[in-house]
Amino acid sequence: MAMPMPTAPPMENTTLVGHPPPPSYDEISGANPYYPAGPYPPADMKASGPPPYPTQEYNQMYPPTAQGQPVTSPVVAVQTVYVQPGLVFGNVPVQAHCPVCSQSVITRLEYSSGPLVWLSCAGLAVFGCIYGCCLIPFCIEDLKDVTHHCPNCSSVLGVHKRF
């Protein structure tokens, strides 16, 4: 004899214990108690009585201005700020706009010893290059920091730090 599987759906004729059976379609498709089933009044018939909301008068008058007083507006000083989008200062000269002399220039480079040069010197000294070889990083421009200057007024436009 085959046993019914526990995951099979229940049979149609069974009812749950303690629960009444659901209503039939005829019972629920009857008249809705919240809406009247009678005919609606004609649309051209006007409702009698007050409007549903109190009306409020709207006055578009502006407050009176004092005569004889001139209208003054504050003076605003405008300063133009030139932003150079995507300008990256590297180890080669770039075309930039100098905010001091207001010229479009190609930058002048100046190299200075930064942290990478000193760390390279210390690293070479640790490995035994004490007799002058540890000073080689001070001669290599690719290890130094780069400062970009304006060739006209010598103002600093940007700095490229190696480390």
From Swiss-Prot:
It is a peripheral membrane protein. Residues 116-136 are annotated as: Membrane-binding amphipathic helix. The keyword Transcription regulation applies. Residues 1-23 are annotated as: Disordered. One of its GO terms (molecular function) is DNA binding. Keywords: Cell membrane, Cytoplasm, DNA-binding, Endosome, Golgi apparatus, Lysosome, Membrane, Metal-binding, Nucleus, Transcription, Transcription regulation, Zinc. One of its GO terms (cellular component) is cytoplasmic side of plasma membrane. Plays a role in endosomal protein trafficking and in targeting proteins for lysosomal degradation. May also contribute to the regulation of gene expression in the nucleus. Binds DNA (in vitro) and may play a synergistic role in the nucleus in regulating the expression of numerous cytokines. Belongs to the CDIP1/LITAF family. This is Lipopolysaccharide-induced tumor necrosis factor-alpha factor homolog. The gene is litaf.
